[in-house]
């Protein structure tokens, strides 16, 4: 009380008021604030008053030898006065101008190489086109984006080793360069930066920009690839956007885009094979994207997309803990639930077994074109706040949330039977059945959901069953917001497991991903994707299957040749022949196969009748389950180029053409590789193989009935005669031998005799 009284007395004197309002601030705390520590507290102000001085810069004494005291205009460039407290010289800003104009020059050859990312950015901006500015509300949502165009995808540790090896090769410290990309980059950079005079630290910083992906969590409306992010400040504000087309693409965006396409193709293909997981792994390991192994890219690339994450899970890599449903990424932000199987009845009285989530939970839902916040209890949607680019996108999000809520009125809104199947013709699980049903038509769902009056909340508006906005009424529990919902920012990755049907689960057993979640969108990859796996041959159509099948046979000929003679059944069952079957007319598959297998068996039985070209040509046809029949074929049909084309059993055709002189095979005009024939082949034809154990008597003799097929000869009794159809439709008369001993000589004499009989 005493002190307050004293202060009151002081304040009543006019002098006190004057001192407090007029005198300068020299309070110790203020002085301390602006003078303690090395950190500049007001850099802009400091710069202004420094630059107003005559000599704001200090430099090493050597500058006095390198720069004249005055410039051409007679202005002083440096002062002889020493800088207080150091033995440096005080220098004028004019000295910098003089140095830039008259100072020593150095080789500039390394600048574009070291500052490559900057030079490339300038080129992209120079060739980019900026369109009109539109003023409109921007729904931005924070997404994790790549802010560094043109980088390789090395991990921080891998990049560090490369940088040390390139910039400080003589420094001590263990560096292990293991991956192909590390070795390639190191070699390339060492060559580029020979005799480089740029400060090593600067080179190291710039290399880091080139090698490592840098991501930030930024508010974005629109394109998220790095060439758009680098101009984010030019293309979108709070209430405006400017159209922009980048003036060039960068490899990292192309890798991301191509990786997604490859992963989607592989997952779709694996789903329909007998063992999806094994097939998926085989394809991932044998695929290259832009010349780099897909598995290497998967290990380094942080892209989060359903198909990519399924491939990562299969390889045992960690993935994000969020889960996917209906093309939206769900992340639980609070609450918890237990799962229980429950049977429910649809509006069509079909029984569905669904896994019900019991308990209160909140989720964020993020899709490409819409985002939402969802609060739900057991089989009840409490609140959905959704925002999106347009009516359509908002409707998609609402359908997914309604199905996810598992509400009874949603299940009762089903009209008709649910029998959706996946690519492998297996029924989808009940939740995806419901989703597909309402994605096709959600009218009944929206009509039955119910509406309610709404309060006037800033930035929120109602939406009616016909998806029109409304200020008074809205679908029960559902509101549309002007603000987007941010993507989940954490980069945390969790250990997951995957079953053979490619369902990915977290350690609690929750399904995070399944092939049903993989988008059906088709795109054209920016980088070349090379699928070496036979399962992916059909992706480029029938011609590619044909060429690839024959290329594979030629590449593996040594192995195939042995199997052909020792274990043909195993050979016929090879998965590499699977795609080929789709080219053979369904009705003819079994007959062709039986015919070719018989032919091959005869070749095996008779010495000197092995024919490399013919085995290669006919082998794919033998893979189908065979049918024993008396059919003989002089040509086999394959469906390519939109119609049936013929492969001649003997001789060349546009489909299969072997050039004896060059020993090269062309399939549909494309080179399929070179063949090495066995030295002893090519003398005896298949005819001799056909006639093991028969004596050729001469030309056809009508008295012995119609010509038999090769298969039917086995029914003849010893000594019986018959006409037989051989080769290119020629018929000769034969007699079955009475003894077996002379079988081998038949094959040698048969060739000569047939020629005589035909001629």
Curated annotation (Swiss-Prot):
Keyword line: Cap snatching, Eukaryotic host gene expression shutoff by virus, Eukaryotic host transcription shutoff by virus, Host gene expression shutoff by virus, Host nucleus, Host-virus interaction, Inhibition of host RNA polymerase II by virus, mRNA capping, mRNA processing, Viral transcription, Virion
Site (Avian adaptation) location in chain: 627
Pfam families in the cross-refs: Flu_PB2_1st, Flu_PB2_2nd, Flu_PB2_3rd, Flu_PB2_4th, Flu_PB2_5th, Flu_PB2_6th, Flu_PB2_7th
Gene Ontology cellular-component terms listed: host cell nucleus; virion component
Subcellular location: Virion; Host nucleus
Main location: virion
The name this protein goes by in its record: Polymerase basic protein 2
Gene source species: Influenza A virus (strain A/Gull/Maryland/704/1977 H13N6)
């Amino acid at each position: 009380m005493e002190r307050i009284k004293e202060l009151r007395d002081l304040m009543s004197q006019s002098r006190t008021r004057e001192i407090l309002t007029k005198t300068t601030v020299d309070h110790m705390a203020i002085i301390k604030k602006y003078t303690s520590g090395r950190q500049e507290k007001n850099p802009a102000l400091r710069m202004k008053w420094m630059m107003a001085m005559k000599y704001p810069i200090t430099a090493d004494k050597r500058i006095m030898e390198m720069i004249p005291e005055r410039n051409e205009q007679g202005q002083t460039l440096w002062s002889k006065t020493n800088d207080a407290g150091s033995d440096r010289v005080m220098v004028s800003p004019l000295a910098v101008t003089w140095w830039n104009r008259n100072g020593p020059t150095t080789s500039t050859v390394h600048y574009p190489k070291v500052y490559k990312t900057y030079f490339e950015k300038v080129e992209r901006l120079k060739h980019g086109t900026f369109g009109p500015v539109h003023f409109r509300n921007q729904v931005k949502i924070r997404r994790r984006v790549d802010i560094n165009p043109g980088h390789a995808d090395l991990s921080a540790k891998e990049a560090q080793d490369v940088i040390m090896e390139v910039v400080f090769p003589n420094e001590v410290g263990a560096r292990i360069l293991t991956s192909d990309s590390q070795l390639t980059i190191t070699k390339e950079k060492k060559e580029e930066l020979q005799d480089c005079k740029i400060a090593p630290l600067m080179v190291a910083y710039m290399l880091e920009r080139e090698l490592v992906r840098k991501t930030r969590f930024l508010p974005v409306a629109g394109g998220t690839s790095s060439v758009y992010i680098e101009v984010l400040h030019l293309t979108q504000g709070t209430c405006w956007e400017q159209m922009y087309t980048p003036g060039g693409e960068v490899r990292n965006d192309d890798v991301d885009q191509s990786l997604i396409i490859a992963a989607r193709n592989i997952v779709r293909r694996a789903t329909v094979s007998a063992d999806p997981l094994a097939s998926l792994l085989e394809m991932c390991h044998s695929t290259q994207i832009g010349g780099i192994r897909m598995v290497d890219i998967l290990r380094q690339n942080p892209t989060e997309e359903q198909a990519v994450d399924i491939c990562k899970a299969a390889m045992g890599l960690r993935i994000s803990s969020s889960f996917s449903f209906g093309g939206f990424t769900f992340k639980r932000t609070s609450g918890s639930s237990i799962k229980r199987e429950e049977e429910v009845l649809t509006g069509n009285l079909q029984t569905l077994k669904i896994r019900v989530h019991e308990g209160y939970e909140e989720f964020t839902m993020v899709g490409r074109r819409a985002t939402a916040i969802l609060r739900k209890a057991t089989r009840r949607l409490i609140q959905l706040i959704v925002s999106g680019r347009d009516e359509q996108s908002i409707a998609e999000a609402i359908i997914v949330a309604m199905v996810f809520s598992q509400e009874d009125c949603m299940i009762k809104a089903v009209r008709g039977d649910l029998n959706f199947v996946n690519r492998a013709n297996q029924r989808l699980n009940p939740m995806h059945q419901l989703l597909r049903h309402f994605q096709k038509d959600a009218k009944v769902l929206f009509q039955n959901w119910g509406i309610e009056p709404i309060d006037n909340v800033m930035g929120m508006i109602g939406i009616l069953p016909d998806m029109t906005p409304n200020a008074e009424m809205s679908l029960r529990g559902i509101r549309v917001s002007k603000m987007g919902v941010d993507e989940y920012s954490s980069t945390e990755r969790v250990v997951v497991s995957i079953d053979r049907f490619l369902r990915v689960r977290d350690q609690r057993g929750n399904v995070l991903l399944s092939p049903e979640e993989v988008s059906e969108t088709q795109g054209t990859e920016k980088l070349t994707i090379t699928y070496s796996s036979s399962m992916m041959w059909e992706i480029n159509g029938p011609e590619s299957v044909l060429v690839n099948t024959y290329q594979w046979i030629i590449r593996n000929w040594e192995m195939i040749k042995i199997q052909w003679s020792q274990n043909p059944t195993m050979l016929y069952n090879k998965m590499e022949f699977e795609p080929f079957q789709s080219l053979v007319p369904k009705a003819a598959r079994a007959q062709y196969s039986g015919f070719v297998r018989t032919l091959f068996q005869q070749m095996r039985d008779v010495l000197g009748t092995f024919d490399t070209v013919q085995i290669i040509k006919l082998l794919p046809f033998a893979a189908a389950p065979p049918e024993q029949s008396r059919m003989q074929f002089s040509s086999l049909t394959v469906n390519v180029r939109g119609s049936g084309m013929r492969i001649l059993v003997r001789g060349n055709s546009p489909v299969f053409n072997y050039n004896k002189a060059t020993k090269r095979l062309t399939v549909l005009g494309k080179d399929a590789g070179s063949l090495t024939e066995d030295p002893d082949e090519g003398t005896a034809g298949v005819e001799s193989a056909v006639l093991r154990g028969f004596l050729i008597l001469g030309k056809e003799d009508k008295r012995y009935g119609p010509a038999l097929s090769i298969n039917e000869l086995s029914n003849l009794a010893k000594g019986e005669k018959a006409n037989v159809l051989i080769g290119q439709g020629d018929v000769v008369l034969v007699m079955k031998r009475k003894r077996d001993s002379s079988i081998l000589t038949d094959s040698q004499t048969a060739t000569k005799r047939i020629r005589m009989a035909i001629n």
